[in-house]
Amino acid sequence: MGRSESQMDITDINAPKPKKKQRWTPLEISLSVLVLLLTIIAVTMIALYATYDDGICKSSDCIKSAARLIQNMDASAEPCTDFFKYACGGWLKRNVIPETSSRYSNFDILRDELEVILKDVLQEPKTEDIVAVQKAKTLYRSCINESAIDSRGGQPLLTLLPDIYGWPVASQNWEQTYGTSWTAEKSIAQLNSKYGKKVLINFFVGTDDKNSTQHIIHFDQPRLGLPSRDYYECTGIYKEACTAYVDFMISVARLIRQEQRLPIDENQLSLEMNKVMELEKEIANATTKPEDRNDPMLLYNKMTLAKLQNNFSLEINGKPFSWSNFTNEIMSTVNINIQNEEEVVVYAPEYLTKLKPILTKYSPRDLQNLMSWRFIMDLVSSLSRNYKESRNAFRKALYGTTSETATWRRCANYVNGNMENAVGRLYVEAAFAGESKHVVEDLIAQIREVFIQTLDDLTWMDAETKKKAEEKALAIKERIGYPDDIISNENKLNNEYLELNYKEEEYFENIIQNLKFSQSKQLKKLREKVDKDEWISGAAVVNAFYSSGRNQIVFPAGILQPPFFSARQSNSLNYGGIGMVIGHEITHGFDDNGRNFNKDGDLVDWWTQQSANNFKDQSQCMVYQYGNFTWDLAGGQHLNGINTLGENIADNGGIGQAYRAYQNYVKKNGEEKLLPGLDLNHKQLFFLNFAQVWCGTYRPEYAVNSIKTDVHSPGNFRIIGTLQNSAEFADAFHCRKNSYMNPERKCRVW
């Protein structure tokens, strides 16, 4: 072998020799065959590997989804012991609540990201902007113009005060200036009709619950200066908030007196503001608790204005209160005359009865101090820095935040809240994928079908009521993404804001203009038909909605993004995300409130007595379940199972419907490829993505606030409560019976 190779090599490098035909040796033939075989094997292996499907999705979208899920979860936690920790443990380790936020969650992160988009589109000058968009950008610039706002101090507010009968504590000789012309009817009405501020009496024009095509006047109990009536106990966990509230009043009164160069008597300021607190405590105690206001049938009390006067007589400053004069003071601002035969709806008869003895105890000065304060406290954040800073301790007591929200964020939200269609146009053009609309339409159709099919499973509901429920489900109208008109009909959009004209240097006046505009628009509706095609939300919103009076579900563009939805992410994630949200909103039509409205949106009892009784029995299971959860962040308080019932019913119904819809999808289309890096099947991924939507935490101060004011359960209990009731979840994660996440007793309504 060596000799032959040497000859070949030598031949190659030495002088040529006479040619003669050479034969391959057996060894050379063997080697050649071996090389050929190895080449064939290598090519075959490469071809097989290139086409080999290991069942793992390797697209960039799958990799992103997997990375997000892995980052958020704590795989070392036991899913059957605490699924919140399992799903969100990683998120909790990585995220800290910002100093400006009272809570932080995946929802809030999406909202933060949306606000960045709004900032970018609102601050970008474009010569081709339509008039409505130009106005939105002017309003935004006026809001972020801190130098102009600071240079004006409290002067814009001082200019406004005479229009609302002043603020006695911050005035000199109030009785002589306003006392002779002051009447309770005029003072309460002025705040309402011009600025939409409802103090002492909540008067508003809204849809008639029993005739949802018409508007009607409503009388209700007012909102309070503190988050809920419980705060006015002013002891224990509420003590700091009460102290900060009174100090806030005193600080603002002091600033206004200083600005007017009036003498300051600290004792007098303290005396008057503590009197306001006493009055507001009595009003708070007169209001009905939220858990006693959950039945819309009991809330609805229709009567004539004359009967209202007869049933609920009030006396202020020794004079009888005229409900007719009060009503006409408000409605005359939009040129509508109200006769005593006008029908109105009273939502709070108990409150109006209890209000009478309270009002007789207080002077016009006391009442005006309260009314003006409640308006002023809303406007403080629109004034110069020293006014804003007077709110710091109060904000900390209620929300736990040590810093104000960044100006640009606050302003982007303010403009979006007041010009939602103009801002929605900008957001949709910048960030919304139009093809999402059709995919979500299909998801809604699937989940609606599942809801109707599952009616057959309900043993507690009779056939007659099931038939009506099916009719209502089929009649639900959906709104997805945004109203087409905000893009296609520029004239309509411009006309919507025709009356508004903003100035960059006058942010405060712009705010007042918005208050007047929105209140006037609402009052004018009294003699107009309800526009049931009107959207109940703007497009640039990370949320979803159900309207009982319209029987309408709405999914704004802002929520149609991961983790809720993407046309390019696994369908298990879409069904666990936006699918669950769709089911949640559909179920709202049949929760403890929505079930009282028929397919046309009218407050009508369409239930048989037996089915209604059974519904209450089924619901009671969830009242107990959620009411037994204690929240450490809120000082160990129990959740309110009654106030959160509607949302809990919707969560439980939504997850069940979405899961069954996903099972139908798999039967039709086959199993999806698994996600890389996760040892989880798609049933498990469905529940994991659902849970991660609610990853988040609260500051203790806001937990105390939220447990009394939010109709939603905190995120961790939305996960735990819903999945404890899901046999499908227990099956997917192989949870043994009677483990924490798989209790023997499960609650189900829908």
Curated annotation (Swiss-Prot):
Disulfide bonds join 57-62, 80-735, 88-695, 143-411, 234-242, 621-747. Its cofactor is Zn(2+). Glycans are attached at residues 145, 211, 285, 311, 325, 628. The modification Phosphoserine is found at residues 4, 6. It catalyses: Preferential cleavage of polypeptides between hydrophobic residues, particularly with Phe or Tyr at P1'; substance P + H2O = substance P(1-9) + L-Leu-L-Met-NH2; substance P + H2O = substance P(1-7) + L-Phe-Gly-L-Leu-L-Met-NH2; neurotensin + H2O = neurotensin(1-11) + L-isoleucyl-L-leucine. Keywords: Cell membrane, Disulfide bond, Glycoprotein, Hydrolase, Lipoprotein, Membrane, Metal-binding, Metalloprotease, Myristate, Phosphoprotein, Protease, Signal-anchor, Transmembrane, Transmembrane helix, Zinc. One of its GO terms (cellular component) is plasma membrane. Belongs to the peptidase M13 family. This is Neprilysin. It comes from Rattus norvegicus.
